[in-house]
Amino acid sequence: MGKPSKKSILLGTDAMTGEEIYTTPKERGAHTHVMGSTDEGKSFGLENMIRQDIRLGNGVCLIDPHGTLYDKIVRWCVTYNFFDHRKIVLLNTSDKQWAFGFNPFNMHGSEQDITARVDSIAEAIATVSGENIDTMPQLRQSIKLVIHTLMEKNLTLHEAKYLMNPIKPKERKYLTKDIQNAVVFEQWEHMNTLRDTEFDVKFGASTRRIIELITSPALRNIFGQTEKTLNTRAIMDEGGILLVNLNPKGISLSESRLLGKLLVNDFTLATRQRDEGDRRFYL
């Protein structure tokens, strides 16, 4: 491990020598893996690192698929009054009284080319749905066609049903009539000439299953918002704290996996727009 500095994180103590073991920001910037058997202290180690990051003023995001670590960090932040002087955002899928907004189609800062975002979102959605779009070119084309259209028109996943429904030709033609991307426009021009049965065959059952997942009632309130939605780029730049509880008690396991994957995907795309010297943020 590197020589400790003011920004280094204490990992633990060497059982043989009693020496404190630290990891430096440079080492963490390369990547960090936490490995171990069940009930061997992985979550405790992560909790310790998160607490230190918050104390040091670092930006942090915790995405907890179980909710236990989320609850511990929230209680700790309350106990030590971090809510009073740090920007802390809580996303809790178990809270039925308030649905947070997250639109994975939002562009970040200087991000101009939507192609990379379309590709990454399509892959994330297909993976969670159990589909391999690399071996299913028609499925890949259909998903990317819908996602590109929603992004270019500044829509949300809630509107996907109008693009996918074979008996909604008027709505589909209205939404696709002035697409700026020439290739996407030509594809919709062709799709809009098909009869209902032909259109239904073209998109296929796999695509509909995927759209049904991302437009489920549990996710509709999250993905269906366009204003005051989560801005991962702003959280990173401002050194904010984002705590996410994806406990399946609030949503299904597949919905939890999809939301988690899209959140990680959004952070990854936002990271690509940041400069080397920007404020450190740990996911």
Task: Kindly label every feature range from the protein language model.
Residues 2-17, 25-283:
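P-loop NTPase motor domains
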Residues 20:
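Conserved oxyanion/phosphate-binding beta-strand-loop segments in alpha/beta enzyme cores
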